[in-house]
UniProtKB/Swiss-Prot annotation:
The keyword Zinc applies. It catalyses: RNA(n) + a ribonucleoside 5'-triphosphate = RNA(n+1) + diphosphate. One of its GO terms (biological process) is DNA-templated transcription. Keywords: DNA-directed RNA polymerase, Magnesium, Metal-binding, Nucleotidyltransferase, Transcription, Transferase, Zinc. This is DNA-directed RNA polymerase subunit beta'. It comes from Enterobacter sp. (strain 638). The RNAP catalytic core consists of 2 alpha, 1 beta, 1 beta' and 1 omega subunit. When a sigma factor is associated with the core the holoenzyme is formed, which can initiate transcription. Mg(2+) binds at residues 460, 462, 464.
Amino acid sequence: MKDLLKFLKAQTKTEEFDAIKIALASPDMIRSWSFGEVKKPETINYRTFKPERDGLFCARIFGPVKDYECLCGKYKRLKHRGVICEKCGVEVTQTKVRRERMGHIELASPTAHIWFLKSLPSRIGLLLDMPLRDIERVLYFESYVVIEGGMTNLERNQILTEEQYLDALEEFGDEFDAKMGAEAIQALLKNMDLEQECEQLRQELNETNSETKRKKLTKRIKLLEAFVLSGNKPEWMILTVLPVLPPDLRPLVPLDGGRFATSDLNDLYRRVINRNNRLKRLLDLAAPDIIVRNEKRMLQEAVDALLDNGRRGRAITGSNKRPLKSLADMIKGKQGRFRQNLLGKRVDYSGRSVITVGPYLRLHQCGLPKKMALELFKPFIYGKLELRGLATTIKAAKKMVEREEAVVWDILDEVIREHPVLLNRAPTLHRLGIQAFEPVLIEGKAIQLHPLVCAAYNADFDGDQMAVHVPLTLEAQLEARALMMSTNNILSPANGEPIIVPSQDVVLGLYYMTRDCVNAKGEGMVLSGPKEAERIYRAGLASLHARVKVRITEYEKDANDEFVGKTSIIDTTVGRAILWMIVPKGLPYSIVNQALGKKAISKMLNTCYRILGLKPTVIFADQTMYTGFAYAARSGVSVGIDDMVIPAKKTEIISEAEAEVAEIQEQFQSGLVTAGERYNKVIDIWAAANDRVSKAMMDNLQTETVTNRDGVEEQQVSFNSIYMMADSGARGSAAQIRQLAGMRGLMAKPDGSIIETPITANFREGLNVLQYFISTHGARKGLADTALKTANSGYLTRRLVDVAQDLVVTEDDCGTHEGILMTPVIEGGDVKEPLRDRVLGRVTAEDIIKPGTADILVTRNTLLDEQWCDLLELNSVDSVKVRSVVGCETDFGVCAHCYGRDLARGHIINKGEAIGVIAAQSIGEPGTQLTMRTFHIGGAASRSAAESSIQVKNKGSIKLSNAKSVVNSAGKLVVTSRNTELKLIDEFGRTKESYKVPYGAVMGKGDGEQVAGGETVANWDPHTMPVITEVSGFIRFTDMIDGQTITRQTDELTGLSSLVVLDSAERTAGGKDLRPALKIIDANGNDVLIPGTDMPAQYFLPGKAIVQLEDGIQISAGDALARIPQESSGTKDITGGLPRVADLFEARRPKEPAILAEITGIISFGKETKGKRRLVITPLDGSEPYEEMIPKWRQLNVFEGERVERGDVVSDGPEAPHDILRLRGVHAVTRYITNEVQDVYRLQGVKINDKHIEVIVRQMLRKATIDSTGSSDFLEGEQVEYSRVKIANRDLEANGKVAALFSRDLLGITKASLATESFISAASFQETTRVLTEAAVAGKRDELRGLKENVIVGRLIPAGTGYAYHQDRMRRRAAGELPAAPQVTAEDASASLAELLNAGLGGSDND
């Protein structure tokens, strides 16, 4: 009995294992799994419904159909367990063995396994070094293959057609051996000597020079080595025995009406068995060769269909014309085993219902309908009822609950107390989509949700539904309370800002409460404290907005963490004094002494959390909510039509704009501007007009002028309802108010181009039919986009999670000195992100020195919290080197110091935190907010007037970087380089502003000159790009042939003529290869050289360029030779939003990437070919020069004789991340990807911490390619896990051997996920077949390191609370203490248990 109990305990424990290995199954192994051979295609008898003997459901092979009962009924009941009935041959045991016992089919002829044949690259083909087509022709009996050449001139593996075979037979007789079909391939594979082949290939590899051959050889060597090392035999890729799946995994269920529902696998197996039996019979009869051959081919096809239907030829379809689901289909895809049953399971103890508001709840509570609670907590209630003796049996308890007796409700109350439940709203995009609450029982049928957690769930109350789950075990309840409770999730893991922030009504209420008003009732009173303020407000003696003096006591923490009070009289308003009553001790009064908008409230809660900690913040947040709701109700703010005040200036602004447009139209008709320029200018005019109208409107709404008590006029901020809602951040924005009371403005077509007639009306005036019709375009586009976006965003999140899922914090400090240099993000005159936001919560990589001194301000390895950041700001530090996960030296994980602060908790990150998944969720969750294209606010085109000048905001000195310029005839500098940057440096040498200066801009100030604030330093024409000459001389046209490469356009109105270069598409055949160009020559007709080089000045003209000069005209340096009309920004290919983020993470090469210098050296140009120039870089140390061919149409940024650094831009374009990694290193590529991704998110106003993006970049960089092997056993050109190389090199260096040299690879997230070491994780992601095939051939072991693998095998994940469990397991295993198995078998135990139960129920065994 003791043994039995011991065993039952052990039953609940799973078998301990450390790794999963996948390999090819040998025929003997398949036979050893099997419990008998399936010989007949029959399934069950249609009359008795009993399984047929030897059929696909045979009870003798697979086990009994009923528990402990043989098929013929001779042996029933438990006492006969283990007996094999002599009549029907069935073992008496549990019926669940039908889920695990397999059978087999002995194939009459070998068949190839289609996965190893057709999954590219074909493993069989690679092993035999034969093309797949040839192998297929052999397998499907179209040609012969020579197996032994013998003494003949036939090679082994040679393919012979029928005729060739017959000729050879006549010539050589039986000297040689040639066969067809799978047995031929099997023989070839059997005869291979893998080790010898391997040696031979290695020799070849050392001798060969050709790159392609090397690649092919390495591939074969890798495959052969995999076979040798894994112990797989090549001939096992050909099946001679086919395993049969246990019958309960391919069920056959009788439906009513005599029909059966069956799994497709049964049909597929039936075909195989039928064909196999027929083939056996034909072989016994010694049938003619051609018939046997046909039958063998059909058998091969049947086995193919069973393993992977549709991979070869047409898929076999069932009766309903649908392709049958084969074994491969069972495991792959969203509906396959991995994603449907292993990674996502449905759970019991859950319910769902509509949500509604619970404004009276506390933050940690939710309202749960009584009906739901009763159903969810049933087992607990039954238990309690029995425990109290209110019900004698479970059955009685059940009856009581069904009758809903009064006592049941009391018990329910007890059960629910302190038992948290989980609330989840789909889609769960980040971890805050599931939180724990304490249930409060309510009447009704809707779940009540606390308003402050809506932001985290992204929930609203327009009919959203939520699911409730009950954590059952004690551990689960503990985790729910300690980790998942809504009160523990105040900060967002994406950016560390509070996510429990009031919104909408609450914000409006607090804003209304803290506004001040001139001449309000009770102005000028002096009050003794907040209590009195509330009293006089309630009594109606003073208005909420009255400006008064109040005595306030503020508390501050001293050195001993005691609160010290300080009382003073402060100018404030009645409302602010009342609000002060709920602010916790320890915060300054200045925090409420302002009109509180949404940002201010968020900041207030953040400050509270940082100063006072979690508990006061939660209480404070709750209080603000109650107060906000109360005062929003009192304020009576609502929207009426008169709140939308249309500015008086509107008509005048619009008529001015119309006049300007008419003028441009005239210029166009007289040929001064091209169609494209006209369109752009018109759009610019309207965009500017729109801005002016909205400015006039906002000025009008914002303030009204009132005379105060002293008779002085002052600007009073308006109490207009619409304005208050927008200003407080409760609802609406300036852009929306503009459409209500300004003008709707320009609209976009669905393709993103902007319609040039704007909608001048607004919604208050109403739209006419045409205007309404124009606006429907954009509005519909918005809806269609949203639908597409959601799916795309979800897929991006899935790829991110998959690539980062196994990244966990595994140690405290890796001790690296590597780091990333952080500087503020400056775009134009604005600091987009100050330094403090970028370094807050990171760990310093080196000491920070106080600027201008040698004093250490912050030591290395300091976590920069708010106080440290204040210190940095105080000393105006403008660059800090911080630790980053990309440089972390930890193997298979990250250290806490390189990660820094846990954003959701505010302290340094704990070991075991799953930072990979957090990063993926933080990047993926806002994905739905990113637009697919970057313009549209309700369809209105948001496009500012194009920039045409640079105006600095502060005073300072100018610094130009990578600038080249010439002085034009007017003595002004003209920029002739393409990625010039202009920085404004203040007197301390800090960068204040930074601008991009385009090619062709005229500079008002030169490098190093001083400028005053507001001065314009550069200007240019935004709509055309000039081609500027760098030398003076005369023009000579080359290849400019009228009608072939150029056409002359004469304007009818003005008679001005200009030349337009034709696009290559528009040219005649003769003009295709011509390169129109302008050459500059001197008076004698000789080429003028570009200064500082020996290149002639020749300017190639791209298509569409307009030349307004004639051949032979004299020009001077800095003049424009031609104009290239720029397309508007609407159609310029800036992939915005989500697709851009996906491109960056997939590390896709841009279409025409920038060309970067491969080495540092001096530029020169070699011999040109027809369409390309030869760029030569000669290194300074005299080593081998580097050559590259560059197409002539690429604009070059460098001149002959110029010195370039490795990684400098030679020719413009978007940079390819792979090039950046290769030439500038890991940190540069990290910086590039981080900044580019952040740009997209910043545009949408989404804040994400850089850390998260760095985590993903680390995962993209986790592979390395071996350049030279050293003493290691890697192959050259092999791609290996970066950690593996590091560990191997450490060992080699420790033993004084030569380390392997490698270069880091940048993989896109999909590639990186598929290249992970764990084949289980990769197979559950994408391309399941390919991953499993590769893994099986290599005999891979999965060490179950990541999260996904552990979820799939059903273990605790090695992160979070499971981290300790896994660490402990590793320790125990290292110490060699693994739990001993009990001495009872599963069968015995469950049987004895059943016997006990029967005895207890008074049943007797002897009837």
